[in-house]
Curated annotation (Swiss-Prot):
Region ranges (Disordered): 249-272
Organism lineage: Viruses, Varidnaviria, Bamfordvirae, Nucleocytoviricota, Megaviricetes
Family note: Belongs to the eukaryotic initiation factor 4E family.
Pfam families: IF4E (PF01652)
Keywords recorded for this protein, A-Z: Initiation factor, Protein biosynthesis, RNA-binding, Translation regulation
Keyword Protein biosynthesis in record: yes
Name of the protein this chain belongs to: Eukaryotic translation initiation factor 4E homolog
Compositionally biased tracts (Polar residues): 255-272
Length: 272
């Protein structure tokens, strides 16, 4: 059993060692999407431009599926080595990805997303994969929070790699958790691999949640990982381009993107 399998089983002690991971169903099914945010911006800004910026790649329904995706997403954290060749992988250096509950469209306007918001963590890219991996284990295992009603409103997770410096537009919302708790941990932005960052966004369907309310329900393991990073919570209904006229029609037009970021053109046809 590899380290990923061991780590996962450590978090789920009730899984007998003699049961193959391929036979263990996740509590619910999820869909992995390749996301092209530049295409979305074009669609939002051009009245007659129709496209679908998110492309469904596969369904994640078993523990084995989850472990396989985590393995494919691995990145090289050595600051002297930049991963540019993906070898068919879907690692976090190459593209932006969304994992969403099956049956929910990965857009703000979906009825199960529209009244909620997104909790965003901005961190140095060198630790982005590790934090993302922990988040998806909790989310897809339905254990991010002990409250069932809160867990049911966690609809998905987006991960993005940003290679240039970018700051949240709401300074009051980007304080680190360490500062919020009165610690002297400071803000870690800019202290890592150049200006390379990982953004992780959690899709939350619950209305009127605040950043601190969301943080308070997270496991201690995650809080410890992100307490010195930049955190923000934003309501979907207040975002630019929310409920743009004909946005649903544009998304459902069936028009394919003209190009794909990264070296990931054939994975969409792969089954497992």
């Amino acid at each position: 059993m590899d380290s990923n399998n061991t780590e996962f089983k450590d978090n789920y002690q009730h899984i007998p060692d003699d049961i193959p991971l391929t036979n263990i169903k996740l509590p619910n099914e999820w869909v992995l999407y390749l996301y092209d945010k530049q295409l979305f911006k074009k669609m939002a800004n051009r009245p007659n431009f129709q496209a679908k910026p998110h492309k469904a790649l596969c369904t994640i329904s078993t523990v084995n599926d989850l472990l396989y995706i985590m393995e494919l997403m691995k990145v090289n954290n050595d600051p002297k080595i930049k991963s540019v060749e993906t070898d068919g992988k879907i690692n976090l250096d190459a593209n932006d990805y969304i994992i969403m509950r099956k049956g929910i469209e990965p857009i703000w306007e979906d009825p199960r997303n529209s009244n909620g918001g997104t909790f965003t963590v901005k961190m140095d890219h060198s630790k982005g994969y590790d934090v993302w991996k922990i988040f998806i284990q909790y989310i897809l295992g339905e254990t991010l929070t002990s409250e069932i009603s809160d867990m049911k409103s966690i609809n998905g997770i987006t991960v993005s790699y940003i290679s240039d410096s970018y700051n949240f537009q709401n300074p009051a919302s980007k304080n680190t958790l360490g500062n919020t708790l009165g610690n002297s941990l400071g803000n870690s932005l800019g202290n890592g691999l150049g200006n390379s960052f990982t953004y992780i966004k959690i899709w939350d369907g619950k209305p009127d949640r605040t950043r601190d309310q969301f943080v308070s329900m997270l496991p201690a393991t995650i809080i410890d990982k992100i307490k010195s990073d930049s955190l923000m919570y934003s309501q979907n209904s207040k975002k630019k381009h929310f409920n743009e006229k004909n946005i649903i029609g544009k998304l459902n037009s069936g028009r394919k993107p003209s190009n794909t970021r990264g070296g990931f053109s054939s994975f969409g046809n792969k089954r497992y």
